[in-house]
Structure formats: structure tokens, C-alpha cells
């Protein structure tokens, strides 16, 4: 079990670092440059590959890259492309070549989200059903540790050693993290039957959507983490408006808050085994949505570091528990032979909901204020908890 968890942890750390770095560092930088909230909200569109990756997941399910293994081969390929993109980005001057920078950021998101398809599929096949609670806690923890590096440590490094050397350091770390998958030997999986392109491409989607309660479940996935998506983006310009420095924001949101996410994800993994998926989704989701409202405290003008640390730790910890429960439930919806497509389609729906919510929240924050968007995002996510109780029942 331990080797499996170490492998998955390194994979999820590596793929989450660059996207987190761009999405978390850039809003802070843009707000410091006095850019408007509606413009910052549109940053969500740059992670569009995460919302559309289900479109190419059937190819990753069906095809393999020579002798590298099936999902292992795709992971190695996309990880090397990701590292190469980061190294190129290191030598781009953001102010003089903003378009080139945004292009590289989009490519990094594309390669990272594509690697995520193969990694999730590998995890589905690697973990037994009874291992998935802890396995998804490791996934959440790996993502969060990647976020600590990409969104916390990197903000501090940017302030100390500058853009170029920060990204070179990041690329070296990601290269080292590639070692476990290079030495891993993937077991051969049952191959899908040969068929026409049309049938082979659409069959996994049709199969998933034809399962009982598939559409209501996807609607739950669409709404469940919207509160997290909105607050994760908008709390950054809010803290800039409260006068916090780049290192301060890096420590609060990138290191301390995400450390709380790791601990709470591991706790959630153990609790999920005891409570089951549905009860965990309801309880963790309800608590997370209520604590989201704590962000109203800095929104109304409170700038005490002690208060901000406390609020951010509580919100991030509870949102992480809800996220872990959702990942576990999503994995249960997957078939082994179409693991990449089944899981990725659910993740894509979740990301599309988050992208739409962040873009809309940026526009609303400009006119209605931060407090309004925090209340609305919590209300929308609470709707998904209500839907779970209606479709599956609290006693499930």
C-alpha cells in the first residue's frame, strides 16, 4: 500500500504545482498592478483545458505509447512537456511579452490537465475499493502540497530571487518528482475492443450517462465545489486590497492554509471509511459552505493578521474535507476499462462549474462587492448538498 501512496503523492504534487503557481501568483500580481476584479476573474478561462479534458480522455484510455506502459507512458510524456514549458516560461519577460507568457501558461495548464487524466486512471486501477478513501486523501494532500509549493513557496521565492530563477528551481523540483513513475512498472490492463472511431470515442460517454442517476450526480459535481473555486480566486485580490505584501499572502494562503488542507484531507480520508461516501459528502459539504461565509470578515475591512490566518485556516481545512469526499465518490463511479474517461468527465464538469463561477464572480465583485460573491457561492454549493440528500438520502 505504501509504495502506491508514495507514487500517487509524487504524481499529484508535480501536476498541481505549475497550474497553482500561475493561477494563485498571477491574481496577486495583477491586483498589485491595479487591474480590475472583472479582468482577474477571467483568469479562470486559462484553466479551460481542465474543464474540457474529457474530450481527449478516450484517446488516453484507448492508446498507449509503445513500451512505456499505458497510463505510465502518457504521464511521463506530459510531465516532460510540462517541465519544458516551465523552463521556456522562465526566460519570458512578462511585461514585455505578456501574450507569450499567457500562451505558456495555457500550455502548462493543457499538459497538466492531460497528465491528470492518466494519473487519475492509474489511481483507479491501482487502488482497491477499500483503499480509495486513504488514496483520495493522498490525492488531495498531494494536490495541496503542490499548491503550497506553487502558490506559497513560489510567491516568497519570487520576492527573493526573481522570476527566472524561481521557475528554474520549480522545474528542477518537478524533474526530481518524476523519478517514482520512471521506476514504476505498470501492470498490463485489459484493452478495449476494436471498433469504429465513432463508436470507440463516444461509447464511454454513452455508457457513463446511461448509468442510474448519472445526470443528477453530474449536476451535484457541477455545483459542489463552486464555493471553493470562487473563494480561492477572490480571496487573493481581497488580501491585496487589505494591504498585505506578497510574502504575507504566500504564507497565509500558500503555506499555512494549504498545510491545514493536507491535515484535514488525511483526517477526511479516515472519516470517509467510517461514515461512507454519501454521509461524508453531506456533512463535509454543509460545514464547508457555512465556513465559506467567514471570508466576509476580511471583506468588511478586517485586516488583523491573526484574524486572517484563523479565517483562512478554517475555510481551507473544511473545503479540503469536502473535496476529498467528492473525489472518493467520483472514483466509485468509474469502471476500470474506461477509468480515464469516467473520472475525467466528472472532474471536467467540476472545473467547468468553477470556471463559470469565477468569471461571473469577478464581474459581480466589481459592482456588488466581495461579501456578495462569498454569500452567493456558498448558497450555490449548499444547493448541491440539498440535492444529495434528495437523490441518495441521509441514511445512504
Swiss-Prot record:
<feature type="topological domain" description="Periplasmic">
    <location>
        <begin position="61"/>
        <end position="73"/>
    </location>
</feature>
<feature type="topological domain" description="Cytoplasmic">
    <location>
        <begin position="236"/>
        <end position="251"/>
    </location>
</feature>
<feature type="transmembrane region" description="Helical">
    <location>
        <begin position="105"/>
        <end position="127"/>
    </location>
</feature>
<feature type="topological domain" description="Cytoplasmic">
    <location>
        <begin position="159"/>
        <end position="162"/>
    </location>
</feature>
<keyword id="KW-1003">Cell membrane</keyword>
<feature type="topological domain" description="Periplasmic">
    <location>
        <begin position="128"/>
        <end position="137"/>
    </location>
</feature>
<feature type="topological domain" description="Cytoplasmic">
    <location>
        <begin position="303"/>
        <end position="304"/>
    </location>
</feature>
<feature type="topological domain" description="Periplasmic">
    <location>
        <begin position="273"/>
        <end position="281"/>
    </location>
</feature>
<dbReference type="InterPro" id="IPR036259">
    <property type="entry name" value="MFS_trans_sf"/>
</dbReference>
<comment type="function">
    <text>Involved in the TolC-like protein HgdD-dependent secretion of schizokinen, a dihydroxamate-type siderophore. Transports schizokinen from the cytoplasm to the periplasm.</text>
</comment>
<dbReference type="InterPro" id="IPR011701">
    <property type="entry name" value="MFS"/>
</dbReference>
<feature type="transmembrane region" description="Helical">
    <location>
        <begin position="215"/>
        <end position="235"/>
    </location>
</feature>
<feature type="transmembrane region" description="Helical">
    <location>
        <begin position="74"/>
        <end position="94"/>
    </location>
</feature>
<feature type="transmembrane region" description="Helical">
    <location>
        <begin position="40"/>
        <end position="60"/>
    </location>
</feature>
<feature type="topological domain" description="Cytoplasmic">
    <location>
        <begin position="95"/>
        <end position="104"/>
    </location>
</feature>
<comment type="similarity">
    <text>Belongs to the major facilitator superfamily.</text>
</comment>
<feature type="transmembrane region" description="Helical">
    <location>
        <begin position="163"/>
        <end position="183"/>
    </location>
</feature>
<keyword id="KW-0812">Transmembrane</keyword>
<feature type="topological domain" description="Periplasmic">
    <location>
        <begin position="389"/>
        <end position="396"/>
    </location>
</feature>
<keyword id="KW-0732">Signal</keyword>
<feature type="topological domain" description="Periplasmic">
    <location>
        <begin position="184"/>
        <end position="214"/>
    </location>
</feature>
<feature type="transmembrane region" description="Helical">
    <location>
        <begin position="282"/>
        <end position="302"/>
    </location>
</feature>
<keyword id="KW-0472">Membrane</keyword>
<dbReference type="GO" id="GO:0022857">
    <property type="term" value="F:transmembrane transporter activity"/>
</dbReference>
<keyword id="KW-0997">Cell inner membrane</keyword>
<dbReference type="InterPro" id="IPR004752">
    <property type="entry name" value="AmpG_permease/AT-1"/>
</dbReference>
<feature type="transmembrane region" description="Helical">
    <location>
        <begin position="305"/>
        <end position="325"/>
    </location>
</feature>
<feature type="transmembrane region" description="Helical">
    <location>
        <begin position="368"/>
        <end position="388"/>
    </location>
</feature>
<dbReference type="GO" id="GO:0044718">
    <property type="term" value="P:siderophore transmembrane transport"/>
</dbReference>
<feature type="topological domain" description="Periplasmic">
    <location>
        <begin position="326"/>
        <end position="346"/>
    </location>
</feature>
<keyword id="KW-1133">Transmembrane helix</keyword>
<feature type="transmembrane region" description="Helical">
    <location>
        <begin position="252"/>
        <end position="272"/>
    </location>
</feature>
<dbReference type="InterPro" id="IPR020846">
    <property type="entry name" value="MFS_dom"/>
</dbReference>
<protein>
    <recommendedName>
        <fullName>Schizokinen exporter SchE</fullName>
    </recommendedName>
</protein>
<feature type="signal peptide">
    <location>
        <begin position="1"/>
        <end position="25"/>
    </location>
</feature>
<feature type="topological domain" description="Cytoplasmic">
    <location>
        <begin position="26"/>
        <end position="39"/>
    </location>
</feature>
<dbReference type="Pfam" id="PF07690">
    <property type="entry name" value="MFS_1"/>
</dbReference>
<keyword id="KW-0813">Transport</keyword>
<feature type="transmembrane region" description="Helical">
    <location>
        <begin position="138"/>
        <end position="158"/>
    </location>
</feature>
<feature type="transmembrane region" description="Helical">
    <location>
        <begin position="347"/>
        <end position="367"/>
    </location>
</feature>
<dbReference type="GO" id="GO:0005886">
    <property type="term" value="C:plasma membrane"/>
</dbReference>
Amino acid at each position: 500500500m505504501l509504495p502506491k501512496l508514495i507514487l500517487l503523492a509524487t504524481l499529484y504534487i508535480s501536476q498541481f504545482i505549475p497550474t497553482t503557481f500561475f493561477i494563485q501568483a498571477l491574481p496577486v500580481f495583477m491586483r498589485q498592478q491595479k487591474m480590475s476584479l472583472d479582468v482577474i476573474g477571467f483568469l479562470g478561462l486559462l484553466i479551460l483545458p481542465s474543464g474540457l479534458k474529457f474530450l481527449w480522455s478516450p484517446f488516453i484510455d484507448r492508446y498507449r505509447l509503445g513500451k512505456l506502459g499505458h497510463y505510465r507512458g502518457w504521464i511521463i510524456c506530459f510531465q516532460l512537456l510540462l517541465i519544458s514549458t516551465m523552463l521556456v516560461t522562465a526566460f519570458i519577460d512578462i511585461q514585455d511579452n505578456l501574450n507569450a507568457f499567457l500562451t505558456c501558461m495555457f500550455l502548462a495548464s493543457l499538459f497538466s490537465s492531460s497528465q491528470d487524466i492518466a494519473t487519475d486512471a492509474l489511481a483507479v486501477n491501482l487502488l482497491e475499493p477499500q483503499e480509495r478513501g486513504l488514496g483520495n486523501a493522498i490525492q488531495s494532500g498531494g494536490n495541496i502540497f503542490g499548491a503550497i509549493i506553487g502558490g506559497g513557496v513560489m510567491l516568497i521565492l519570487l520576492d527573493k530571487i526573481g522570476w527566472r530563477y524561481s521557475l528554474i528551481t520549480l522545474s528542477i523540483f518537478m524533474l526530481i518528482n518524476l523519478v517514482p513513475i520512471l521506476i514504476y512498472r505498470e501492470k498490463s490492463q485489459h484493452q478495449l475492443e476494436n471498433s469504429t472511431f465513432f463508436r470507440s470515442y463516444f461509447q464511454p460517454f454513452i455508457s457513463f450517462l446511461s448509468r442510474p442517476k448519472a445526470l443528477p450526480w453530474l449536476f451535484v459535481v457541477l455545483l459542489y465545489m463552486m464555493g471553493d473555486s470562487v473563494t480561492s480566486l477572490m480571496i487573493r485580490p481581497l488580501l491585496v486590497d487589505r494591504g498585505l505584501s506578497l510574502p504575507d499572502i504566500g504564507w497565509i494562503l500558500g503555506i499555512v492554509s494549504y498545510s491545514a488542507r493536507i491535515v484535514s484531507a488525511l483526517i477526511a480520508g479516515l472519516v470517509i471509511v467510517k461514515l461512507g461516501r454519501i454521509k461524508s459528502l453531506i456533512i463535509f459539504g454543509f460545514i464547508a459552505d457555512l465556513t465559506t461565509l467567514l471570508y466576509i470578515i476580511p471583506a468588511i475591512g478586517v485586516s488583523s493578521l491573526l484574524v486572517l490566518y484563523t479565517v483562512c485556516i478554517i475555510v481551507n481545512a473544511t473545503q479540503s474535507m469536502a473535496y476529498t469526499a467528492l473525489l472518493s465518490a467520483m472514483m466509485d463511479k468509474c469502471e476500470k476499462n474506461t477509468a480515464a474517461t469516467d473520472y475525467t468527465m466528472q472532474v471536467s464538469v467540476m472545473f467547468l462549474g468553477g470556471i463559470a463561477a469565477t468569471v461571473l464572480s469577478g464581474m459581480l465583485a466589481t459592482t456588488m462587492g466581495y461579501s456578495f460573491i462569498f454569500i452567493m457561492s456558498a448558497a450555490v454549493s449548499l444547493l448541491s448538498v440539498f440535492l444529495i440528500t434528495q437523490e441518495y438520502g441521509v441514511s445512504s
